[in-house]
Amino acid sequence: ISADGSRYEGNLRGGKQHGKGNLRRADGYTYNGDWVNGVKEGIGKITMSDGGTYEGEWQAGTIVGQGVAIHASGERYEGGFRNGKRHGKGVLATPAGYEYKGDWVDGQATGQAVIKDVDGAVYEGSVINGARSGVGKLVHPEGFTLEGTWANGQLNGTGKIISANGDTYEGDLVEGRREGSGTSTTSAGDTYSGQYLNDQRHGTGTFKGADGYAYEGLWAEGSAAGAGTVTYPDGSIQTSTFVDNLAEGPGKITYPDGSTYEGDWSAGVIEGQGRAT
């Protein structure tokens, strides 16, 4: 029994703990395991005053090697350690249902991993400091999939989104939003290929409907806006300026039989001055 109230029971050599032994401190901390010249070395288990435990390998008094740590909160980690920190391969599981299985560096979840979130989503790929960063794929139980380059937990760079209804997007993303150049395809067969801004069609792009309708031109905030050309399912071709998807102002339409109208439009309807041939 030491002056500080600690109590040791076990083998000694030269007045030092050596071999198998149990140390119990006044604050409730205990260690039961191997000792070498007064230092924890080999296999041992500690129990903290709050009930948390670690059982596994020790080197020179420090947690190094393989072991299992269970925190008072119920959080459980099994895997590699270095200098008392998670390091190498390991699995972390929380009572809430979160699970991380993969690489650790000096206590940080960094490297390649499979993460199961509490909502059932599963991510497989690169992780930096616990956040999705690098190349990876997320599959959500609601049916959608996110795949590509990640930064700080969001798709950032080139990626692919597959919605639960079968709609897809493949192209540039910024913080999870479609932004830059990309191609969207609906489950019905409609496609849009062009520029995006803040998750909306914006800039130059081409829409092709499964019914044969097509628009090529300028877009703003998700709608045809500016100079563009429409090809209708019957083969008619209209060139005009568009506002909120409707022709507005001067334009020209050529019908399948070769006849034309060139003149003014208002809210998608021929109205004003014009000439038909």
Regions found by a protein language model. Give the residues of each.
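Conserved anchor residues at repeat-unit boundaries in beta-strand-based tandem repeats, strongest
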Residues: 7-18, 30-41, 53-64, 76-87, ...
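N-terminal compositionally biased, intrinsically disordered segments and leader/signal-like regions
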Residues: 3, 95, 111, 185-187, ...
